[in-house]
C-alpha cells in the first residue's frame, strides 16, 4: 500500500486565502496527500501568500529562508521536500520568487491552483514550474468537491467563494492586478456547494469575495442575481442557521442587500464595510469614488433596515498627502459611526499601483503617531461594544471545545467569542447564553433557559444601555 504524502499549507492574509488553502487540500487529496501541522516533516509545503502589504510579502521570503534549511535537512535524510508559493505574491512576483529563493519548486497564481497536480509533476521531472497567467477556464469547474470527512473535520462554519477579483482599482491596492477582473459564480453552483456543506454538519456559511457585494452570478432564471437575492435563496437551505458575507465595497451596496438584512433572520447583523479614510480629499486620491457623507448615509440605510446591525471597517493612515485635517476627518468619522471593531494600517506602497508614484509622502513618525491615536479610538469603541453585552442574553452558535477543560466556545452574531461550561453535545447548536463577564475579547457566561427573543440580545433593567454609537444625517 502506498504511503500517503504529507502536505503542509501556511496561509497569510485574508479569508479568501483560508478558503483557497482548503480547496488546494481538496485538489491534492486524490494525489495521495494528507495534511500535517508540521512543515518539517512534509513532502510538500505550500505558502499561500498575501501581497496587500509590504510586510506580508517580506514574511513570505523570511519563511522561505527557513524552509530552504528544512529542505536541505530532508535531502540529507534521503527525502524530497517540494516547496510551492501560491497566492497573490506568486501572481505579482512570478519568476522573481525563484530568483530570490532557488529552493522553490512551484509558483502558482490564485487563479491556477487547480493545476497544482500537473505543476508538481512538472517539478518532479527536475524542473521548476511557474503558472501566473489568468486562465480562460474556470478553476471552480475543475476543483474536486471536498470529501464528507474533510468537511466534518473543518467544523461547523465554512467559507464559500461566490466572487473573485475587483474592478474598482483603488490607487493603493494590488488586488485587481493579482486576482483579476470581477467574476461571479453561478447561483446553482453555489447552492450545490452550500447543500453539500449543510448535509455534512456545517451550520454557518460566510460568502466571500474580494468585493463580495459586486456579486452578479447567473441565476436559475437566466438573469444575473445580486448578492441580496443569493442570500434569500441560501437562507432556504435546511441546516444553515447563519449567513455572513465579506468583504464589501460601499459603492456596490444595493437595496436588495439592505432588504436582506431587514428580512432574513439567518443573515447576521454584522457588516464589514471598509471606508479607508474619513477625508473626501484622501478618498478621491484613493479612487474610492464615494465621499465620507456617502458612507454615512449608507450606514444609516443599513441601520434603518435593521437597528441591530453593527459595523467593522478598514482604515489606512499616512496615505500620500494626508494632512492633519484629513486625519482629523477620519477620527471624526470613526467617532460618529461607532464600530464594533476595525483594522487600521499604515500606508504601504505596493509596486505597480498608482499611489506608489505619489511624491507627497507622510513621514514614518507621523504615520506611527496617527496609527496609535486611531487604534486607541477603535479599541475603546470595541471595548464599549463588548462591555455592553454584560448582563444580557445573547444567541451563540457553539463551534468547538475551548482550551479550558469543560468549556465550549461559540460566537455571537457579532463574532464575539463566548465561553460556557457545558457538554460537547451543544456544538452545532444556537443557544441563549447569559453573559456574566468579559475576559479581554471573550465573553464568559452560562447557558440560559430557552426563551423567546425579540432580537439578538435581551437586557435586564439594570444592564448597560444600547451600543454607544450614533449616525450621521
Curated annotation (Swiss-Prot):
Gene3D superfamilies the record matches: Methylthiotransferase, N-terminal domain, tm_1862 like domain
Residue ranges of every copy of the MTTase N-terminal domain listed in the record: 5-125
Region of interest: Disordered: 452-473
Compartment list: Cytoplasm
Keyword Repressor belongs to the record: no
EC number annotated for this UniProt entry: 2.8.4.3
Cofactor(s) essential for the protein: [4Fe-4S] cluster
Function: Catalyzes the methylthiolation of N6-(dimethylallyl)adenosine (i(6)A), leading to the formation of 2-methylthio-N6-(dimethylallyl)adenosine (ms(2)i(6)A) at position 37 in tRNAs that read codons beginning with uridine.
NCBIfam families: miaB-methiolase, MiaB/RimO family radical SAM methylthiotransferase
Family: Belongs to the methylthiotransferase family. MiaB subfamily.
Name of the protein in question: tRNA-2-methylthio-N(6)-dimethylallyladenosine synthase
Organism: Rhodopseudomonas palustris (strain BisB18)
Encoding gene per record: miaB
